Regions:
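Short, well-ordered beta-strand elements
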Residues: 99-111, 130-135, 158, 214
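Extracytoplasmic "Venus flytrap"/periplasmic binding protein-like
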Residues: 126-202, 208, 233-242, 262, ...
Length: 562
């Protein structure tokens, strides 16, 4: 069984879903360094986008080394559905770009880091022509480590920072500690690194901090990653029809549920409800704002938000949700076993589970078939979905690094950003053939050494455009990408899509309590009126002033999506 070889960059939620890791708490203790543009009375925060960003961005040059079986469309990933042919692998980096220097990289790591001088690291360093030395840090406490390192005078050559670790003063520290890569990558300069030139422009825009191009991105599809999964085999067997409206879903849930027979319709469907009712994205705070009739509105202020919560509450109140869902997030266990056992037939989670659930059940439960419902509009019409960010993990180069080190880092990135179907991609993602993996019937299979050594390292320096490839389950790869394409066709970009925004520190925690209140409301522990009061309190505690701050940002910079 091959690991999930989708290279789509994760949001915090999808990364947690696929890696079962916990993000660190917000750390403090950093000096407030040079803030981004558009600051408010010294409180920090701001962005560079729209009019000013274009001159900073690298030129986009499509990579024609490999042709995907399914091209990207409507913000989807590219897809590959054929068997892997080692003999047919292409070369995307024909000569070593590295000059043989040493580069230290600090990165989050989940699990036990491999020894420094292992076969995978040696193979990668030899291919690139750079001696990469890893400073792996526990991903669960990474933000605290970042705070200490960025506050010190000793910063590694490269530091990887996921978007979910950019709390507190870290965005302003990024501006103060890391180099401007524009002189190496802006405009046509990027053509020296063809794989970096093939990274989508939206992903590069997310790399602008403090008015400079400072990051190297891990690109992602901008289509929602939350899929309403269902047991297609049981649906077919029972004759259930897929719902096309919120009312039809409720009726279907009633038909499915039989508590005496230990079968329920679903788990907590709140995330899907937000999509069904067209609620602005909650994946990152700036995405929750939208200009409506000249006024910026935050997602929690909308009628759609309340309607989505009320609809989800009704699912729970009617007893259609599995008892496990009543426990809430903190007590939830892995949904897989009970989904496989048919205790519930629908749940929503990250799109990566389309593959992982299929792979889990392939041998022991050959009749098992998972599929994803298309998101429907609550009233039976087309839904309105909102784009997620096109990159959310970044690598930064120290300001103190000499040009030779910057060039060596870019040499690393040009290899790690190689597309699927190349020798560079296979080495980056699977290691050395025969040492870390073998290919059986067109499917790469990692051995124990591969699973121990070839894990979340080089891919975090930079990655190719979002990619889905499952040679062991090509139908799943096709289904995932085609789902993204259909959902992408009804996806809109909100006012601050693609922008890298640091909110003023005094307001960064203002909306942190809404998620817990949502969960309490849908489970009947709180009322919709409690949310209305919380929104009123939010406005008074700074929400209205934050709105004014965002409006000035929009007036000064223009919308990123425009």
């Amino acid at each position: 069984m091959t690991p999930n070889s989708a290279s789509a960059a994760p949001s915090r939620r999808s990364f947690l879903a696929s890696s079962a890791v916990a993000a660190a708490a917000v750390a403090g203790g950093l000096p407030l360094l040079a803030a981004c543009g558009g600051s408010d009375g010294g409180s920090g925060g701001g962005t560079t986008s729209g009019k000013d960003a274009k001159k900073l961005l690298p030129s986009y040059v499509a990579n024609n080394v490999v042709t995907p079986d399914i091209p990207a469309r409507n913000g989807s990933a590219v897809g590959f559905t054929g068997p892997l042919d080692l003999a047919g692998l292409k070369t995307s980096v024909p000569k070593k770009l590295g000059a043989g220097g040493k580069v230290t990289i600090m990165s989050p790591f989940w699990g036990s880091p491999p020894k420094q001088d292992n076969a995978y690291y040696r193979g990668m360093n030899d291919l690139i022509g750079v001696d990469v030395v890893w400073q792996n840090q526990d991903g669960n406490t990474y933000e605290q480590k970042l705070g200490a390192v960025l506050a010190s005078s000793s910063v590694p050559d490269v530091v990887v920072i996921p978007g979910w670790n950019m709390g507190g003063k870290i965005p302003s520290a990024i501006t103060g500690k890391f180099a401007d890569l524009g002189p190496y990558l802006s405009g046509d300069k990027v053509k020296e690194y063809p794989n970096l030139a093939a990274i989508p422009t939206d992903a590069w825009q997310r790399c602008i901090f403090g008015g400079k191009l400072r990051g190297l991105p891990m690109p992602a599809s901008c289509v929602t990653n939350i899929v309403p999964f269902y047991r297609k085999d049981i649906f077919d067997q029972e004759g259930y029809e897929l719902p096309c409206s919120a009312d039809e879903f409720m009726a279907l849930a009633k038909d499915i549920t039989n508590a005496r027979a230990k079968r329920w319709a679903c788990l907590d469907m709140k995330w899907t409800a937000f999509n069904v009712f067209g609620v602005l994205s909650g994946s990152e705070k700036p995405l929750g704002w939208e200009l409506v009739d000249g006024k910026l509105i935050y997602r929690v202020e909308t009628q759609e938000y309340l309607e989505a919560l009320e609809w989800t509450r009704k699912l729970f109140a009617a007893g259609y949700a599995h008892p496990d869902a009543e426990l809430g997030k903190s007590a939830q266990t892995d949904a897989g076993p009970k989904f496989a056992a048919g205790e519930f037939l629908i749940y929503n989670d990250d799109i990566s589970q389309w593959y992982s659930r299929t792979a889990e059940q392939a041998a022991q439960n050959p009749d098992f078939k998972i599929s994803g419902m298309d998101v429907f509009g609550h009233d039976g019409g087309a839904p309105t979905l909102w784009a997620t960010q096109p990159a959310n993990i970044f690598a930064f180069v120290s300001k103190k690094a000499p040009e030779s080190v910057v060039r060596d880092v870019l040499a690393v990135a040009d290899v790690t950003a190689a597309p699927y179907g190349t020798k560079e991609y296979m080495l980056t993602n699977y290691g050395v053939e025969g040492t870390h993996y073998t290919v059986e019937n067109g499917v790469p299979v990692k051995n124990d050494k591969g699973n121990n050594e070839v894990i979340n390292a080089y891919v975090m320096v930079a990655s190719p455009a979002a990619t889905v490839a499952h040679p062991d389950f090509p139908d799943v790869a096709r289904a995932q990408v085609e789902w993204q394409q259909r959902m992408g066709a009804v996806t809109r970009k909100s006012s601050f899509y693609g922008m890298q925004i640091a909110e003023p520190s005094r307001w960064t925690n203002l909306s942190n309590d809404f998620e817990q209140l949502e969960d309490d409301i849908v489970r009947g522990h709180k009322k919709i009126s409690d949310m209305q009061q919380a929104v009123s309190d939010w406005k008074g505690k700074g929400g209205d002033r934050l709105r004014d701050w965002y409006k000035k940002l929009l007036d000064d910079n223009g919308p990123a999506a425009g």
